[in-house]
Amino acid sequence: MSYNDPNLNGQYYSNGDGTGDGNYPTYQVTQDQSAYDEYGQPIYTQNQLDDGYYDPNEQYVDGTQFPQGQDPSQDQGPYNNDASYYNQPPNMMNPSSQDGENFSDFSSYGPPSGTYPNDQYTPSQMSYPDQDGSSGASTPYGNGVVNGNGQYYDPNAIEMALPNDPYPAWTADPQSPLPIEQIEDIFIDLTNKFGFQRDSMRNMFDHFMTLLDSRSSRMSPEQALLSLHADYIGGDTANYKKWYFAAQLDMDDEIGFRNMKLGKLSRKARKAKKKNKKAMQEASPEDTEETLNQIEGDNSLEAADFRWKSKMNQLSPFEMVRQIALFLLCWGEANQVRFTPECLCFIYKCASDYLDSAQCQQRPDPLPEGDFLNRVITPLYRFIRSQVYEIVDGRYVKSEKDHNKVIGYDDVNQLFWYPEGIAKIVMEDGTRLIDLPAEERYLKLGEIPWDDVFFKTYKETRSWLHLVTNFNRIWIMHISVYWMYCAYNAPTFYTHNYQQLVDNQPLAAYKWATAALGGTVASLIQVAATLCEWSFVPRKWAGAQHLSRRFWFLCVIMGINLGPVIFVFAYDKDTVYSTAAHVVGAVMFFVAVATLVFFSVMPLGGLFTSYMKKSTRSYVASQTFTASFAPLHGLDRWMSYLVWVTVFAAKYAESYFFLILSLRDPIRILSTTSMRCTGEYWWGNKICKVQPKIVLGLMIATDFILFFLDTYLWYIVVNTVFSVGKSFYLGISILTPWRNIFTRLPKRIYSKILATTDMEIKYKPKVLISQIWNAIIISMYREHLLAIDHVQKLLYHQVPSEIEGKRTLRAPTFFVSQDDNNFETEFFPRDSEAERRISFFAQSLSTPIPEPLPVDNMPTFTVLTPHYAERILLSLREIIREDDQFSRVTLLEYLKQLHPVEWDCFVKDTKILAEETAAYENNEDEPEKEDALKSQIDDLPFYCIGFKSAAPEYTLRTRIWASLRSQTLYRTISGFMNYSRAIKLLYRVENPEIVQMFGGNADGLERELEKMARRKFKFLVSMQRLAKFKPHELENAEFLLRAYPDLQIAYLDEEPPLNEGEEPRIYSALIDGHCEILENGRRRPKFRVQLSGNPILGDGKSDNQNHALIFYRGEYIQLIDANQDNYLEECLKIRSVLAEFEELGIEQIHPYTPGLKYEDQSTNHPVAIVGAREYIFSENSGVLGDVAAGKEQTFGTLFARTLAQIGGKLHYGHPDFINATFMTTRGGVSKAQKGLHLNEDIYAGMNAVLRGGRIKHCEYYQCGKGRDLGFGTILNFTTKIGAGMGEQMLSREYYYLGTQLPIDRFLTFYYAHPGFHLNNLFIQLSLQMFMLTLVNLHALAHESILCVYDRDKPITDVLYPIGCYNFHPAIDWVRRYTLSIFIVFWIAFVPIVVQELIERGLWKATQRFFRHILSLSPMFEVFAGQIYSSALLSDIAVGGARYISTGRGFATSRIPFSILYSRFAGSAIYMGSRSMLMLLFGTVAHWQAPLLWFWASLSALIFAPFIFNPHQFAWEDFFLDYRDYIRWLSRGNNKYHRNSWIGYVRMSRSRVTGFKRKLVGDESEKSAGDASRAHRTNLIMAEIIPCAIYAAGCFIAFTFINAQTGVKTTDEDRVNSTLRIIICTLAPIVIDIGVLFFCMGLSCCSGPLLGMCCKKTGSVMAGIAHGIAVVVHIVFFIVMWVLEGFSFVRMLIGVVTCIQCQRLIFHCMTVLLLTREFKNDHANTAFWTGKWYSTGLGYMAWTQPTRELTAKVIELSEFAADFVLGHVILIFQLPVICIPKIDKFHSIMLFWLKPSRQIRPPIYSLKQARLRKRMVRRYCSLYFLVLIIFAGCIVGPAVASAHVPKDLGSGLTGTFHNLVQPRNVSNNDTGSQMSTYKSHYYTHTPSLKTWSTIK
């Protein structure tokens, strides 16, 4: 169609052809150029046609005509005019018939088939075994349409001749093995015999025929059927065959399970087996029968495989169809059982045995419809549901069982892996199913009590011990090497009487032997891994490894490593050299290295001898389903080795020289230093003396964590380098010097996009290229990416030729000038979307791309998109109204600022439409000249909201424009429907004879093109909630169907139960835009398949995909999310992308040739998944959107490029293409156990890898993808991913991959997936360990007199002053550590910078990097890392991982302080503030510049949520927010409030305590989730023990800093610092308890009475208690300062220690004393109001007060902490909000909007403005009052210290003696102050004979 066609005005509304992105009407300003239709095809006049453009008998070279046969291009291969398309047998009648029921999933067009005698088809050309791959099946051939002279007949005759059959490649071929009627009869017969549903049968018939048609279009029908049977049933890659042999069903069929004797073969049997094997290898097809007789009785896998292939080879086409049909019918109704592929195989096997039996064939009456579902599937479904949900009060409630108690899909499935499992299937009468004859088993399936059959086959226990087993090799490669490094560099530990002044060395044997203990460490790790495996894999399961032998082997190896080392230390006395010991030590070191290497390389599952050895069939199932890894070959394998050799070579070298050697001096000094301290009242100087050794222990532990971190650092660097190298190799980098990407673009379009080899009518390439290029440009114009003047410059135009009367095509100058870099303003708007898209298109075509097949040969594929509640189409209200009270901008305003050029194009377009419509309606010409000002005023509405008239067609345009620039389903559908346009375009361009055939009949041509597109491409949206949509959602869904009639929507339909008390009936239904609309406005479904019950048993998405999966069509599925986009130019590459599956052009081998070895063929590892790139279209919408986009780009592109090559890429959902047959027969496209499979997509990838599939990555194709844009939504996604990784750590997939992958693949898998998250965890862990080390180290430095240090002097020199402590090397370690953490952090930015550099050039990369730095994105990265690790820690400790829907909108609203604080306090702010206090102590105690980095990092943890909050620093909003914070703290105690401090505390606590099940129907119960109580052991490990270690570390530092080091005192002068901690920790708690008892008594006695006259009793009571708690805690802060003798440094460490001790107490109380939380908040309000009698708690009202009192004790301290911390955070923002115009600068930083495009401040009414100002004044006063009080608490004691007597507290005696720290005492006992000054040097010099004796 023309883009200046005035008849298109209303088309964007109904959009019947479904081809546009809303198909806006479009216009051309100038009329002198030739028009183009929607494919970019020039619309030619009849004259032009007569001039020969489309006459096959004439050829052109740029318009020059040649006589037939003399075209010089004929000899040039691709342009050669081969045999005519029409010279094919014309007499093939259409065999299909119409029987009143349309089996196709689309409505046929044209007259019914068989009506006309000439309704004929071109037969497929056989592509098997040796013919051309082209199929003409889809091209209509009408007798008499075109004759040899090129004459045309009546176009109507052509239309009548169109094929009406949806499966032409199969039905039109005379060699089809079975006619379609017979196939249909098979389906109907099976449906009757098994009781399948009729709709399911129709659906599966269409599914099967589409598969046959898809394959027949590129191979012969016979080969298509054979390959399909091989894929589903009998081929080496068929899952059914793999299962059949794994579960030894062949032996069941031969001798019966009951007669099987599995065990070792006798010697005689082994000899016979060897002989048979030789016979099979030498067998030829002729003597197959003889070989079969010879191997009879041989049960080996080879013999079984030979028998199988012989059997398959004898199958007739009828039997093949029947077998596939039966499998598909079982699969189509299997519901949740589709997630258990081997269970489904077992059901199919039983059904197949029954089908082949006489009992089935002779059965007179069919089984009732629904028998298969109700009798076979529903009992299994109900069992699976009962594991996750239980019935409480008549409704289904999620069970509280954790994963290790839930028998999930995988446990159910794995029962069927082994004959021993199948043998456990027992009837109610005790009969084993296997004891029945095979043909009787199917009818007995309904009698099995499944509850008694299934058991756990792997325990997903919530424990960190999974990491010990799964990643044992990682621990060995790090812990053992770290031990060896440290042992070698810590000689002082094993040197007798080491003295630094002499630097005496240890015996050589000791050095060797100590390092050799690394081998023992490795053995210990393996023993621990084996013991953990024992606890995770039940011995009951037949697939469990035999661990006893491995355990004893490991013990022996540990003994071999440990024994000689003990000998060395025992035999070799520490002062006497022994040659024997030296030799043993050295040998043992190399034995240890060998042990270390062996254990590092060998997978745990393959240690000593693999339990899956192929000589026995015992473990074939585990080999098949958990270890069929596709091997890497050639360059890929060497690259994989090279990557990891490089990583670990660099890592071990760098770690040794940088990390370990920086520890050498601190080890020497700290291990030999003993402190001269007075000590503590309770235990003297026992602890303070060894403070250096405690510090050393902490330093070694901290460095140990760093030792893990730098491996990940090197992985990032090496991966990036290799990825960059590959990008240069492929030619996708912008820096690649040898490409002229735009100059060569036309040629590349011709060679890489178009399949021109088989074209019948040959054209000059320019004619074909121009149509493709013009279509791309016009599609961009229609999407308002280009203005009309840009379009004119970019299009190919027809111009007069030099030959008179002829026309030729002129290429746009763009192709030449683009490479000259002078194109910025000439062809595109600068930095526009159009420029990006065309640049990528050009760049991608310069890479190697598989050759495309012709359109009619390409396979059929489906795009599948799950939809839940995402926006379909934005409403007008959402676009032009501010979305909430905190927003300052409407969505439309924001979009206009983000896309100014596109808005301008849209407005111009709309104005033209409005003017034309007005002219058409008024029927008169406009005045020629209007007043310019009036015209501008009239245009204002267009520029503001996009329309002037409120007519639906105008408002809809604006809605569509906004929806196409937001994350909506409409954007996704309009984008991916470009596949349809691309297929039509390619088909039209590559088959010009079709255009000729139709002549001027545009409608007939369009229908033919649509039919081809419909045949090759389906779009399926799984819209599970459609039946429950609200009216506006329904309206939007209906709009989609009208705009895109071929769109298919699968949804869940619900009907009330037939009988009362039963469950409602639920159906999977399918509709499209062709479905009839019923009276109620709904559409009549095409297919409606009943399910066993509600299919949503998991977290939603995977179940949603699974229920819709039965409606997919074709061979491949592309999985897409509802916030993606696609573009026409990318869709043109679809044929090449599908060719990546390596199934289109391969040499076909007969799959059932006997003698082909099982598992030895390269085809045994098909491509399961092809991943693709994503462009994050939200990348420039501010700093956070850009950070999220950058991460996605680097992960999805830069790393995926390398990972795919070295075998480490998995499936991440969108936008991957999957091999549908491979994946659907192996459990589907995702996994669905609730909680465990939270990140559902990645499990499908792991499943594919485990089962032998390959995963590739496609560089030249990319989709668009939206990402979260706000701080909260990005971190919600982060939390979901982190928690999901916690669940993955527990999963069996990680166990199989971790214990069975070869070392290089294992390392790739680990560092690409769990390693990233564990790295984040290690970073946070190292930060906390460092803080603990810093506190102790700086306490040591603060109390010591340090030596004058010169690093260049020998270590044996005497240090001055005499008696000093040389802690400089230890203090300098802080600098080295900081540098390490700094590098680890900044390395995260390397990939994104490199990615930007290679794709967009140096300038863009530098620009983006500095933009990120100036926008403080490093602070966000620090915070996000903490959220990752917090989510992971929390999930493994307490569970509760759940699906968090991610944000799809723009983050322009200011979020209240209270919401941000409550959301991030537990995960980051608390940890940051505790660490900040410790850092403050470290900074004050001993200043070092490197600590500035930690100040920045910890500031990020505390302040990041507020820095990235829009308009956080607007003055008025800030104080109104403060008002909201104060109200948040105080509300919720009188009556429930959704957003209150008490609600936040209760929800946080419930994650540990869990909720009670009792409900009283209160509103407060709605916000509570279903948290179950966490396991107490996990809580002790995760909460109490780390807290106790931290408290102990701080306490040791505190007692040391008070231990009076260097002070000349007596034992009587020892201070009582422990009592200070006890007082300041416990006194506030005791006072709080007293206050609570008083309040409780008062509320119980007078609360109900007061409540009658005072509505706020509860709030007042709570306010009093909370206020006292705040005051008490502040008072005891000052008390600690006083007790520490007004020393600020000592007070700081005292406060830190008190906080840690209180945390420990409260954790213990929560875990050990608190019972479950009620879902309602009645207990809380009753505590303050005294109204216990009306709570509805029943008898619990008697026990609840005690529980509530315990909780309130904790709450008062928490309230004080939140009050103080919240105010501190707000106070620190004061300097920022005082900066003039800070809000504008802050908005520029967040949104990257120029000042001219700034978001305006909101406009308020006078009343609102007055009210706001009054509130601001009031709360501003309160804010400054609190600020003054806080300042007073710090300034007061500091000033008072000068006026307080020096001997304060000296009068205290007894236990309280020295409670106050002495002030102004000298701690310098060095030099002349030493009591042993003169003899000091000599007394510390050892006698020579103590160290140098040599034997």
Curated annotation (Swiss-Prot):
Compositional bias annotation for Low complexity: 65-78
Organism: Saccharomyces cerevisiae (strain ATCC 204508 / S288c) (Baker's yeast)
Assembly information from the UniProt record: Component of the 1,3-beta-glucan synthase (GS) complex, composed of two alternate catalytic subunits FKS1 or GSC2, and a regulatory subunit RHO1. Interacts with SMK1.
Lineage of origin: Eukaryota, Fungi, Dikarya, Ascomycota, Saccharomycotina
Keywords assigned: Cell wall biogenesis/degradation, Glycosyltransferase, Isopeptide bond, Membrane, Phosphoprotein, Sporulation, Transferase, Transmembrane, Transmembrane helix, Ubl conjugation
EC numbers, comma separated: 2.4.1.34
Listed name of the protein: 1,3-beta-glucan synthase component GSC2
GO cellular component, one term: prospore membrane
Extracellular topological domain residue ranges: 1-473, 533-550, 604-1579, 1642-1758, 1843-1895
Residues joined by cross-link Glycyl lysine isopeptide (Lys-Gly) (interchain with G-Cter in ubiquitin): 278, 405, 929, 934, 1558, 1566
Induction: Under starvation and during sporulation. Also by pheromones and calcium in a calcineurin-dependent manner.
Other remarks on this protein: Deletion leads to caspofungin resistance.
Subcellular location(s) per record: Membrane
Enzyme class: transferase
Listed GO MF terms: 1,3-beta-D-glucan synthase activity
Region span, Disordered: 1-143, 269-292
